[in-house]
A protein has these predicted regions:
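Short secondary-structure junctions
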Residues: 23-26, 182-186
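Terminal domain-start leader segments
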Residues: 1-59, 94, 155
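Residues at the C-termini of beta-strands that transition into short coil/loop
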Residues: 54, 63, 80-83, 101, ...
Length: 186
């Protein structure tokens, strides 16, 4: 698996900040914890939270810090044992904490509030949707690469794997294995 280039991650953060400024003027902080959005911004999926402010972005990792550092070209990755550490770093809490409300659970929002004591939750769902709507050159290249993997596995390899007596489960396992060996995330 090839790491997402640092320049791509930085461009995504810059676009996020610009859209937040347009849609939520005066915003102070956004918290990303959903794995897909986390991968989009950091290039890795670990347990923790990405906290984005207009002036900085820090990826706080609870587990697998070393893995995060090895997989990601994100500029600021820090270990944390508890959200208390991240909250202490920032000092005062923002009035509105922006989260991905379509994905954030009420339990997670309550836990975040316990440590950051913000007054209300705001949604950056529309920002994320707008951001991911237009693909970068890197994203288009990755889509083409993914398509090539699928084409090879489904058009070239799958016909060779199919034989009398193979179960659907066994075929799925073998196809999945072929995809992952070629760089698919599965």
């Amino acid at each position: 698996i090839r790491p997402v280039p640092a320049s791509e991650l930085e461009a995504r953060l810059e676009k996020f900040r610009r859209l937040m400024d347009e849609m939520h003027p005066g915003w102070e902080m956004a918290a990303v914890n959903h794995k897909i959005a986390m991968y989009y911004f950091t290039g890795t999926m670990q347990e923790g939270v990405l906290l984005i402010r207009p002036q900085d972005a820090i990826f706080w990792v609870r587990r697998n810090y070393e893995r995060a550092v090895n997989e990601s070209h994100f500029s600021d990755i820090r270990p944390m044992h508890s959200f208390r550490e991240a909250a202490a770093f920032y000092g005062s809490a923002p009035r509105i904490m922006y989260v991905e409300t379509k994905k954030a659970t009420l339990d997670w929002e309550r836990m975040l509030h316990k440590y950051f004591a913000f007054e209300e939750v705001g949604s950056f769902d529309a920002v994320l949707q707008e951001l991911r709507l237009r693909k970068s050159a890197y994203e288009l290249q990755q889509m083409e690469r993914s398509g090539a993997i699928h084409e090879t596995v489904l058009d070239v390899i799958a016909p060779k794997l199919i034989h009398a007596g193979i179960s659907e489960a066994q075929l799925a396992i073998e196809l999945y294995s072929e995809m992952v060996q070629r760089g698919s995330h599965g």
